């Protein structure tokens, strides 16, 4: 839970394209700032090489966390209703740092922007490097700088979305902060939660972060172009994925070579066709 990981800061939105207002908003967690972190540590009677330490939050921390999440869930449902009314397919991309979120989104925008106008909300602790990169690829990108907060929240997404002309896009991608723990807990109002892990992270990644992979509708196994170079065992990886996340659609992809992307795009097109009408120019209706 994020109230136990030291998250507390001011979040700001920096944006270009469709400028409305100053593009900054303050976001703080008073509960995060004011509560001490109490942990109950496990038994240390075993030898150092055998110790497993279990850390459990106290009741006060649990109550605070439940309150934070309850508020976030209400705001996420509000986001979801708003996005659905606009006919938007909204995706929340989660991964560890360096798994290739930005590269994949950049490739998607380059391939699909003409037929599927796309905006991106980018979450990072600092800098707007990824947002600038995506703008160069043709995306409308809004940067949310979270400071010490290691995830995006529904309120941040709502404020960032206010900077976008949602009537002229049909897909919204949320690139979450690179982290496979805290973002899992926070619903942002998305239609699809897309979890990425790269071949460089090891076949057991899903076993180490089961909650994240269990929460995904889609899993993208990225950087397939270097799978052989890192001796990636695809069969073992798929076995682990199916064990942890049998509900998810899985695609093996490479942003560099384009491997697997057509199947991923077809999945998105089919999903959007089933749930929303395609974006139609009113002049042609």
Swiss-Prot record:
Query: Gene3D superfamilies given for it?
Result: P-loop containing nucleotide triphosphate hydrolases (3.40.50.300)
Q: What results from gene inactivation? A: Disruption of the gene abolishes hydrogenase activity but does not affect urease activity. The hydrogenase activity of the mutant can be increased by the addition of nickel.
Kindly state which keywords UniProt assigns to this record, in alphabetical order.
GTP-binding, Hydrolase, Metal-binding, Nickel, Nucleotide-binding, Zinc
Q: Which GO terms describe its molecular function?
A: GTP binding; GTPase activity; nickel cation binding; zinc ion binding
Top-level taxon in the UniProt lineage: Bacteria
Q: Where is the composition biased (Basic and acidic residues)?
A: 27-36
Q: Where is this region: G-domain?
A: 90-251
Sites binding Ni(2+) 1 sit at: 2, 5, 7
Ligand binding (Zn(2+)): 150-151, 182
Q: Which CDD domains match?
A: HypB (cd05390)
**Disordered: annotated span:** 16-54
- The residues listed in the UniProt record as binding Ni(2+) 2, with positions renumbered to this chain, are 150-151, 182
Residue intervals passing through the bilayer:
none
Query: What's a Pfam family in this record?
Result: cobW
- Provide ranges: composition bias, Polar residues: 44-54
As for family, the record states: Belongs to the SIMIBI class G3E GTPase family. HypB/HupM subfamily.
Q: What does this protein do?
A: Involved in the maturation of [NiFe] hydrogenases. Required for nickel insertion into the metal center of the hydrogenase. Exhibits a low intrinsic GTPase activity, which is essential for nickel insertion.
The name under which this protein is listed is Hydrogenase maturation factor HypB
């Amino acid at each position: 839970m994020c109230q136990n990981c030291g998250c507390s800061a001011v979040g700001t939105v920096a944006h270009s394209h469709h400028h409305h207002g100053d593009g900054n908003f303050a976001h703080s967690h008073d509960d995060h700032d004011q509560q001490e972190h109490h942990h109950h540590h496990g038994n240390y009677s075993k030898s150092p090489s055998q110790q497993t330490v279990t850390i459990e939050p106290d009741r006060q921390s649990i109550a605070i966390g439940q309150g934070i999440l309850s508020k976030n869930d209400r705001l996420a449902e509000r986001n979801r209703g708003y996005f659905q009314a606009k006919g938007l397919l909204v995706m929340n991309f989660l991964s560890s740092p360096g798994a290739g979120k930005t590269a994949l989104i950049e490739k998607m925008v380059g391939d699909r922007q003409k037929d599927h106008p796309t905006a991106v909300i980018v979450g990072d602790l600092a800098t707007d490097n990824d947002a600038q990169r995506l703008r160069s690829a043709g995306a409308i990108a809004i940067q949310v700088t979270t400071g010490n907060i290691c995830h995006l929240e529904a309120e941040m997404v709502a404020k960032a979305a206010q900077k976008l002309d949602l009537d002229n896009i049909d897909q919204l991608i949320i690139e979450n902060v690179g982290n496979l723990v805290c973002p899992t807990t926070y619903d942002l109002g998305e239609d699809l939660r897309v979890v990425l892990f790269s071949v460089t992270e090891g076949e057991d990644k899903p076993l180490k972060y089961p909650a994240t992979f269990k929460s995904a509708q889609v899993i993208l196994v990225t950087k397939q172009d270097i799978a052989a170079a890192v001796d990636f065992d695809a069969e073992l990886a798929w076995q682990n994925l199916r064990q942890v996340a049998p509900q998810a659609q899985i695609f093996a992809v490479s942003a560099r070579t384009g491997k697997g992307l057509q199947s991923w795009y077809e999945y998105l097109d089919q999903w959007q066709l089933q749930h929303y009408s395609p974006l139609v120019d009113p002049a042609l209706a």
